Amino acid sequence: MKVRKAIIPAAGLGTRLLPNTKSIPKEMLPLVDKPVIQYIVEEAVAAGIEEILIITNRGKSPIEDYFDYAPDLEERLVKDGKQSEAETVRAVADMADVFFLRQKETKGLGHAIWRAKTFVGDEPFAILLGDDIMLSEKPVLKQLVEAAEDNSCSAIAVREVPDELIVKYSSVKLEEKLGDRVYRIGDMNEKPTLDEKFSNYAILGRYVLTPGIFDILAHTAPGRNNEIQLTDGMKELCHGEPMCAVDFEGRRYDTGNLKGYLEAIIDFALKNQEAGDWLREFIREKAKNL
Protein backbone atom coordinates (compact mmCIF):
# COMPACT_ATOMS: atom_id res chain seq x y z
CA MET A 1 0.00 0.00 0.00
CA LYS A 2 1.28 3.44 -0.96
CA VAL A 3 0.35 6.42 1.25
CA ARG A 4 0.29 9.66 -0.78
CA LYS A 5 -2.38 11.77 0.88
CA ALA A 6 -2.76 13.28 4.34
CA ILE A 7 -5.42 15.15 6.29
CA ILE A 8 -4.59 17.77 8.91
CA PRO A 9 -7.66 18.67 11.01
CA ALA A 10 -7.32 22.34 11.98
CA ALA A 11 -10.89 23.42 12.69
CA GLY A 12 -10.69 23.71 16.49
CA LEU A 13 -11.24 27.00 18.29
CA GLY A 14 -8.11 26.86 20.44
CA THR A 15 -9.93 27.82 23.64
CA ARG A 16 -7.12 26.49 25.84
CA LEU A 17 -4.81 29.21 24.52
CA LEU A 18 -7.12 32.22 24.73
CA PRO A 19 -6.76 35.18 24.39
CA ASN A 20 -3.92 34.41 21.91
CA THR A 21 -6.26 32.45 19.68
CA LYS A 22 -9.05 35.01 19.63
CA SER A 23 -7.77 36.39 16.32
CA ILE A 24 -4.91 34.01 15.42
CA PRO A 25 -5.55 30.34 14.57
CA LYS A 26 -3.77 28.18 17.14
CA GLU A 27 -2.06 26.35 14.28
CA MET A 28 -0.44 29.65 13.24
CA LEU A 29 1.10 30.43 16.63
CA PRO A 30 4.89 30.77 16.25
CA LEU A 31 7.19 27.95 17.29
CA VAL A 32 10.63 29.61 17.17
CA ASP A 33 10.85 30.69 13.50
CA LYS A 34 7.86 28.92 11.93
CA PRO A 35 4.17 28.47 12.76
CA VAL A 36 3.12 25.22 14.41
CA ILE A 37 1.34 23.88 11.34
CA GLN A 38 4.43 24.19 9.14
CA TYR A 39 6.22 21.59 11.27
CA ILE A 40 3.28 19.24 10.74
CA VAL A 41 3.27 19.77 6.98
CA GLU A 42 7.04 19.24 6.90
CA GLU A 43 6.64 15.94 8.77
CA ALA A 44 4.06 14.80 6.23
CA VAL A 45 6.31 15.72 3.30
CA ALA A 46 9.27 13.94 4.92
CA ALA A 47 7.11 10.81 5.13
CA GLY A 48 6.48 10.86 1.38
CA ILE A 49 3.10 12.60 1.38
CA GLU A 50 2.35 14.40 -1.90
CA GLU A 51 -1.11 15.90 -1.31
CA ILE A 52 -2.38 17.45 1.93
CA LEU A 53 -5.91 18.50 2.86
CA ILE A 54 -6.22 20.90 5.80
CA ILE A 55 -9.69 20.89 7.39
CA THR A 56 -10.47 24.41 8.57
CA ASN A 57 -13.36 26.46 9.86
CA ARG A 58 -14.42 30.08 10.10
CA GLY A 59 -11.50 32.32 11.13
CA LYS A 60 -8.79 30.04 9.74
CA SER A 61 -8.06 31.93 6.50
CA PRO A 62 -4.53 32.91 7.69
CA ILE A 63 -3.57 29.24 7.26
CA GLU A 64 -4.67 29.33 3.62
CA ASP A 65 -2.79 32.58 3.04
CA TYR A 66 0.36 31.15 4.62
CA PHE A 67 0.60 28.20 2.23
CA ASP A 68 -0.19 30.34 -0.83
CA TYR A 69 2.32 32.22 -2.98
CA ALA A 70 3.00 35.86 -2.01
CA PRO A 71 4.35 37.46 -5.22
CA ASP A 72 4.17 41.04 -3.90
CA LEU A 73 6.17 40.12 -0.81
CA GLU A 74 8.69 38.10 -2.81
CA GLU A 75 9.16 40.96 -5.28
CA ARG A 76 9.73 43.43 -2.45
CA LEU A 77 12.25 41.17 -0.75
CA VAL A 78 14.21 40.67 -3.97
CA LYS A 79 14.19 44.42 -4.63
CA ASP A 80 15.59 44.98 -1.13
CA GLY A 81 18.39 42.49 -1.75
CA LYS A 82 16.86 39.82 0.50
CA GLN A 83 17.02 36.92 -1.94
CA SER A 84 17.37 34.29 0.79
CA GLU A 85 14.25 35.52 2.57
CA ALA A 86 12.33 35.53 -0.72
CA GLU A 87 13.35 31.92 -1.36
CA THR A 88 12.29 30.95 2.17
CA VAL A 89 8.86 32.49 1.65
CA ARG A 90 8.38 30.74 -1.69
CA ALA A 91 9.57 27.39 -0.34
CA VAL A 92 6.58 27.26 2.02
CA ALA A 93 4.16 27.30 -0.93
CA ASP A 94 6.30 24.81 -2.87
CA MET A 95 6.48 22.15 -0.13
CA ALA A 96 3.46 20.15 -1.27
CA ASP A 97 0.08 20.40 -2.96
CA VAL A 98 -2.00 21.79 -0.09
CA PHE A 99 -5.79 21.96 -0.31
CA PHE A 100 -8.39 23.31 2.10
CA LEU A 101 -11.91 22.27 3.11
CA ARG A 102 -14.17 23.78 5.75
CA GLN A 103 -15.75 21.46 8.29
CA LYS A 104 -18.68 23.92 8.59
CA GLU A 105 -20.12 22.13 11.63
CA THR A 106 -18.13 21.23 14.75
CA LYS A 107 -19.31 17.66 15.06
CA GLY A 108 -16.06 16.07 16.18
CA LEU A 109 -12.86 14.66 14.72
CA GLY A 110 -14.65 11.74 13.10
CA HIS A 111 -16.93 14.12 11.23
CA ALA A 112 -13.96 16.24 10.08
CA ILE A 113 -12.25 13.15 8.66
CA TRP A 114 -15.46 11.94 7.00
CA ARG A 115 -15.70 15.29 5.21
CA ALA A 116 -12.44 14.43 3.43
CA LYS A 117 -13.73 11.27 1.75
CA THR A 118 -13.84 12.80 -1.75
CA PHE A 119 -10.25 14.06 -1.42
CA VAL A 120 -8.99 10.66 -0.27
CA GLY A 121 -10.93 8.47 -2.69
CA ASP A 122 -10.05 4.78 -2.45
CA GLU A 123 -6.48 5.22 -1.20
CA PRO A 124 -4.94 4.69 2.24
CA PHE A 125 -4.22 8.03 3.85
CA ALA A 126 -2.57 9.69 6.83
CA ILE A 127 -3.96 11.94 9.56
CA LEU A 128 -1.79 14.39 11.52
CA LEU A 129 -3.58 16.26 14.29
CA GLY A 130 -2.99 20.00 14.10
CA ASP A 131 -2.09 20.37 17.79
CA ASP A 132 0.49 17.61 17.97
CA ILE A 133 4.13 18.37 17.18
CA MET A 134 6.64 15.52 17.08
CA LEU A 135 10.39 15.75 17.65
CA SER A 136 12.19 12.64 16.39
CA GLU A 137 15.13 11.50 14.27
CA LYS A 138 12.87 9.60 11.88
CA PRO A 139 9.55 11.42 11.31
CA VAL A 140 6.82 9.75 13.36
CA LEU A 141 4.50 9.60 10.37
CA LYS A 142 7.22 7.85 8.37
CA GLN A 143 7.44 5.24 11.16
CA LEU A 144 3.70 4.66 10.74
CA VAL A 145 3.81 4.57 6.94
CA GLU A 146 6.55 1.94 7.03
CA ALA A 147 4.58 -0.19 9.51
CA ALA A 148 1.41 0.16 7.42
CA GLU A 149 3.21 -0.79 4.20
CA ASP A 150 5.10 -3.69 5.81
CA ASN A 151 1.93 -5.18 7.33
CA SER A 152 -0.63 -4.06 4.70
CA CYS A 153 -2.90 -2.52 7.32
CA SER A 154 -3.88 0.67 9.10
CA ALA A 155 -1.38 1.96 11.68
CA ILE A 156 -1.72 4.36 14.59
CA ALA A 157 0.84 6.03 16.85
CA VAL A 158 0.75 5.02 20.51
CA ARG A 159 2.73 5.75 23.64
CA GLU A 160 2.44 4.38 27.19
CA VAL A 161 1.09 7.04 29.55
CA PRO A 162 0.27 7.09 33.29
CA ASP A 163 -3.22 6.47 34.67
CA GLU A 164 -3.98 10.17 35.09
CA LEU A 165 -3.50 10.68 31.33
CA ILE A 166 -5.01 7.52 29.81
CA VAL A 167 -8.47 8.71 30.89
CA LYS A 168 -7.96 11.77 28.62
CA TYR A 169 -6.96 9.77 25.55
CA SER A 170 -7.98 6.60 23.71
CA SER A 171 -6.74 3.30 25.15
CA VAL A 172 -5.73 0.42 22.87
CA LYS A 173 -5.59 -3.33 23.43
CA LEU A 174 -2.28 -4.67 22.12
CA GLU A 175 -2.03 -8.24 20.90
CA GLU A 176 0.84 -10.06 19.19
CA LYS A 177 4.05 -8.29 18.29
CA LEU A 178 4.44 -7.79 14.53
CA GLY A 179 7.86 -6.14 14.48
CA ASP A 180 10.12 -3.73 16.31
CA ARG A 181 7.74 -1.55 18.39
CA VAL A 182 4.79 -2.68 16.23
CA TYR A 183 1.79 -4.62 17.62
CA ARG A 184 -1.53 -5.95 16.39
CA ILE A 185 -4.50 -3.99 17.79
CA GLY A 186 -7.40 -5.99 19.20
CA ASP A 187 -9.63 -3.19 20.47
CA MET A 188 -9.74 0.42 21.67
CA ASN A 189 -11.96 2.86 23.55
CA GLU A 190 -12.25 6.65 23.85
CA LYS A 191 -11.35 8.34 27.17
CA PRO A 192 -11.98 5.27 29.33
CA THR A 193 -12.27 5.13 33.08
CA LEU A 194 -9.45 3.24 34.79
CA ASP A 195 -11.76 0.21 35.00
CA GLU A 196 -12.57 0.43 31.28
CA LYS A 197 -9.05 0.90 29.87
CA PHE A 198 -7.52 -1.86 27.76
CA SER A 199 -3.98 -0.71 28.57
CA ASN A 200 -2.00 2.43 29.29
CA TYR A 201 -1.05 2.74 25.62
CA ALA A 202 -2.72 5.89 24.29
CA ILE A 203 -3.36 7.00 20.71
CA LEU A 204 -1.34 10.18 20.10
CA GLY A 205 -2.02 12.26 17.04
CA ARG A 206 -0.77 10.29 14.02
CA TYR A 207 -2.68 7.73 11.95
CA VAL A 208 -2.53 5.83 8.68
CA LEU A 209 -5.97 4.46 7.78
CA THR A 210 -7.57 2.55 4.94
CA PRO A 211 -10.49 4.18 3.09
CA GLY A 212 -12.84 1.68 4.73
CA ILE A 213 -13.07 4.13 7.63
CA PHE A 214 -15.35 6.42 5.59
CA ASP A 215 -18.24 3.94 5.28
CA ILE A 216 -17.97 3.35 9.01
CA LEU A 217 -17.92 7.05 9.93
CA ALA A 218 -20.97 7.61 7.73
CA HIS A 219 -23.08 5.58 10.18
CA THR A 220 -21.13 6.16 13.42
CA ALA A 221 -23.46 7.63 16.03
CA PRO A 222 -22.36 10.66 18.06
CA GLY A 223 -20.47 9.56 21.15
CA ARG A 224 -18.75 11.49 23.91
CA ASN A 225 -19.72 15.20 23.95
CA ASN A 226 -22.34 14.37 21.29
CA GLU A 227 -19.58 14.34 18.66
CA ILE A 228 -18.64 11.74 16.06
CA GLN A 229 -15.48 10.24 17.52
CA LEU A 230 -12.76 8.94 15.21
CA THR A 231 -11.87 6.33 17.84
CA ASP A 232 -15.38 4.86 17.66
CA GLY A 233 -14.96 4.46 13.92
CA MET A 234 -11.48 2.96 14.25
CA LYS A 235 -12.79 0.53 16.89
CA GLU A 236 -15.19 -0.90 14.31
CA LEU A 237 -12.50 -0.81 11.62
CA CYS A 238 -10.04 -2.85 13.70
CA HIS A 239 -12.72 -5.50 14.29
CA GLY A 240 -13.19 -5.91 10.53
CA GLU A 241 -9.63 -5.69 9.21
CA PRO A 242 -6.05 -5.76 10.57
CA MET A 243 -4.74 -2.67 12.34
CA CYS A 244 -1.41 -2.14 14.07
CA ALA A 245 -0.04 0.17 16.74
CA VAL A 246 3.40 1.75 16.50
CA ASP A 247 5.05 2.60 19.82
CA PHE A 248 6.79 5.46 18.09
CA GLU A 249 10.28 6.79 18.77
CA GLY A 250 10.35 10.50 19.52
CA ARG A 251 8.71 13.09 21.72
CA ARG A 252 5.21 14.48 21.28
CA TYR A 253 4.09 17.98 22.32
CA ASP A 254 0.47 19.04 22.67
CA THR A 255 0.77 22.64 21.50
CA GLY A 256 -2.93 23.17 22.07
CA ASN A 257 -2.27 23.85 25.75
CA LEU A 258 0.13 26.32 27.37
CA LYS A 259 2.39 23.74 29.02
CA GLY A 260 2.93 21.72 25.86
CA TYR A 261 3.34 24.85 23.75
CA LEU A 262 6.02 26.31 26.03
CA GLU A 263 7.86 22.98 26.27
CA ALA A 264 7.93 22.79 22.48
CA ILE A 265 9.24 26.35 22.18
CA ILE A 266 12.14 25.61 24.54
CA ASP A 267 13.10 22.25 23.01
CA PHE A 268 12.83 23.40 19.39
CA ALA A 269 14.70 26.63 20.16
CA LEU A 270 17.53 24.65 21.76
CA LYS A 271 17.86 22.67 18.52
CA ASN A 272 17.75 25.79 16.36
CA GLN A 273 21.12 26.62 14.76
CA GLU A 274 20.82 30.35 15.34
CA ALA A 275 19.18 30.35 18.77
CA GLY A 276 20.41 27.15 20.42
CA ASP A 277 23.79 28.25 21.82
CA TRP A 278 22.78 31.60 23.28
CA LEU A 279 19.49 30.22 24.62
CA ARG A 280 21.35 27.42 26.38
CA GLU A 281 23.62 29.99 28.05
CA PHE A 282 20.63 32.19 28.90
CA ILE A 283 18.89 29.25 30.61
CA ARG A 284 22.02 28.41 32.60
CA GLU A 285 22.20 31.99 33.89
CA LYS A 286 18.50 32.04 34.69
CA ALA A 287 18.72 28.72 36.52
CA LYS A 288 21.18 30.19 39.03
CA ASN A 289 18.37 32.32 40.45
CA LEU A 290 15.60 29.73 40.38
Identify the residue ranges that each predicted region occupies.
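Conserved beta-loop-beta/alpha segment of the NTase-like Rossmann-fold superfamily
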Residues: 73-75, 86-174, 218
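Positively charged, low-complexity intrinsically disordered leader regions
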Residues: 1-6, 278-284
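Catalytic-core segments of class I nucleotidyltransferases/pyrophosphorylases
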Residues: 126, 145-149, 177-280
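Cofactor-binding loop segments of dinucleotide-utilizing enzymes, especially the Rossmann-like FAD-
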Residues: 11, 56-57, 130, 159-160, ...
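N-terminal glycine-rich phosphate-binding loop and ensuing alpha1 helix
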Residues: 2-79, 139-140
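Residue-level signal for inorganic ion chemistry
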Residues: 37, 63, 116, 131, ...
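Residues at the starts of beta-strands that form the adenosine-phosphate
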Residues: 5, 50-52, 97, 124, ...
